Amino acid sequence: MLEELFRLDGKVIVVTGATGLLGRKHAEAIACYGGTPILLDLSQQAVDNFANELNAKYKGSSVGFSVDITNEKAIKNNAKLIIGRFGKIDGLVNNAANNPKVEDSKEVNFSRLENFPLDIWHDDIAVGLTGAFLCIKHYGFMISKNPNGGSIVNISSDLGLIAPDQRLYKKDGISKDKQNVKPVTYSVVKTGLIGLTRYLATYWADKNVRCNAMCPGGVKNGQPEDFLKEVSVRIPMARMAYSDEYQGTLLWMLSDASTYLNGAIIPVEGGRTAW
């Protein structure tokens, strides 16, 4: 039956940043459609609580691990634990990333490129890009050993396809050199994930491992009304996304409904990048 193509029964899928706003939605979609989400985040208590919540609701066997994805040894050991417990890994959702926000002072706005701290640059790249690489190196390699391969989904952004419109953050009465901006690392990380996706799409294709990127737009999550209004006029659908609006796309990308999808960069952003 056609609807069965979207099912994830028996599939073991690693989700990084699993207790964040979208990470929770990704994991919930996997569990709802019969898969076993392996929840990775920094807090063991948070992933344990979320795993218990998912298992109670969907009668699954989700499990959580505290893993720093910038630590290769931790990832390598965790991959062995997962294989020891479940025997395989079928999918990976590279979702973890810093949300780069830099505290400003009265004298200097550190979000601006000319003032951006090098240590924050290194940290953002380490989590969002190096972390994704390390997860692919170890979890993805395990996927490549499956007889039927599997699926890797990198969570990029509409801002991996277009530049951030810094006018959204402009405030009256503040000089240009003090205005807030979307930090440079966000664009670098999200664009880098697109390049990584294309590389992987050709690297393990002979082992039936597909790699694709989703480029979600911004999610409505308590932003000020004036900001929501400014963003909305830049989106053909005239609104930001709801947090559950990416679940269907993710299920399609992970499931057998998309077995010929490979190397695709899929915008899910209300049409923003079409303008």
Predicted regions and their residues:
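Short C-terminal tail/terminal secondary-structure segment
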Residues: L2-L5, F110, I174, L251, ...
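A conserved structural motif in NAD(P)-dependent oxidoreductases
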Residues: I235-Y246, A257
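Canonical Rossmann dinucleotide-binding motif of NAD(H)/NADP(H)-dependent dehydrogenases/reductases
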Residues: L5-I38, L200
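Catalytic Tyr-X3-Lys loop
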Residues: D90, F110-F133, V153, Y186-V188, ...
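Catalytic loop of short-chain dehydrogenase/reductase
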Residues: E114-L118, V153-G192, T197-D206
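Amphipathic alpha-helical dimer-interface segment in Rossmann-like NAD(P)H-dependent oxidoreductases
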Residues: K80, A97, L118, D123-P147, ...
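Conserved glycine-rich Rossmann-like NAD(P)H-binding loop of the short-chain dehydrogenase/reductase
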Residues: Y33-N49
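Short, small/polar-rich loop/turn modules that mediate ligand/substrate recognition or access, typified
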Residues: A205-R210, L261-G263
